[in-house]
Amino acid sequence: MTLASGIEVSPEGVAAICGRYRIRELAVFGSAARGDMRPGSDVDILVEFEPGTHPGLGFFRLEEELSELFGRRVDLGRKSLLKPLVRPSVLRDAVVLYAA
């Protein structure tokens, strides 16, 4: 699949990573979702884990794997931890790439 920003990402790769890390939903937001990325921009990704999943240090491994998959540095955030002030704009921009 191709994001609005022109980044190519493998749906199978996304699904495999999400399965390994017990991710319920993965979405891209920010400039990658809107299509206004700059050359040095990172990819903002929001995840929601399956109930009872506590990734611990696996969160950082997940960020590294996603960076490899997207071919850019990934800034990973948890949907459940979004601050109320930014939540509406983040969710408005979000493009879901995986949902279980």
Map each language-model feature to its residues.
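Catalytic core of pol beta-like nucleotidyltransferases
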Residues: M1-E25, R34-P39, E50-A100
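N-terminal beta1-alpha1 ligand-phosphate binding loop
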Residues: S31
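Short hydrophobic/aromatic beta-strand micro-patches
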Residues: L46-E48
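Conserved histidines in hydrophobic membrane contexts and catalytic metal-binding motifs
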Residues: V28
